[in-house]
Amino acid sequence: MKPKVLKIIPKSKNLLPVSIGGNNPLFTIAEIGLNHNGDIELGKKLIDAAHEAGCISVKFQNFETEDVYIEGKKAGKYELLGENIEIYKLHKNLEIEFNFLSELKQYAENKGLYFFSAPMGNNALKMLMDLDCDLVKIASYEISNLPWIRKVAETNKPIIMSCGGARLEEVDRALNEIYKYHSNVALMHCVIKYPALLHEANLQIINTLKTAFEIPVGFSNNGFRHKSGEIDYETAPHAAAALGMEVYEIHITLDREMDGVDQGFSTEPNELKEMISHVNATRSKFLDSQNIEVDEICIGSGIKKTLECEKYVRAFAYKSIFSIKNIKKGDKLSMNNIKCLRSGE
């Protein structure tokens, strides 16, 4: 059976059409995410770093905080890299406007980079549609939120969907919702622990997902470290490429010492350039059926389940149903009186 591919047809004349999967080159994503810190010039410098490293695309996150967490301090604090962060306030400070994204999209496309985002909420998705982005990302935390998945699929844009923390049956349900509209989709294996230990990478899941769903599968790298605490930027991406990943996503920063929630586990420009060169070379060897040595520590069992190290983030950030109005006995539940939000603390 001929492998399915995800096809992206760009609107910008500065971009070439892309096919992901099969015998095609690796599709590389520089995840800028929230690391722009609300500063458009910092965002441009990160796009420059992605371009200089040889990435094919840059990805952001956009949202209105009310569509992500319950309002104010009720959302609680999130533990990351030894700090307890007031999560609602953090997101509120990182909301970005249409003009901010529009300028960065134009800047990226002028450099020949695809630009897209992981939207959170209807207004965020509308912003991307108004920008006419060429593809959309569905974050791991949305994979059980079937109404949202339908909403994204209705746009008929190509979708890259992460499935960190999910069980195989949850991935199956989410894909079936997308298939009601189209099949132009790729999956991303990731571990929702920031950063995780190398032995928690379980990269064999890449092949588990390929076998189960027969669509392109990639690896979203949220950072890995040794038990000593030392960050490792080489072992996991090399092994993922050797196992046949078709998309590679990595968080980037100009400096891990910068302020910002995700800076501390992100990849700096010099590391990024070396990493992208390395994974592309490994991808070429894989396509040529060459023997590739990998460190067995990050291969894992290949069983797709919620890992022990993912349970905290899954409980905090996967979507739950909240009432947004007083609901009386006998009232019908609808999006007028309930909302899907991250659970929080």
State the predicted function of each range:
Residues 1-345:
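Catalytic cores and adjacent flexible loops of soluble metabolic enzymes
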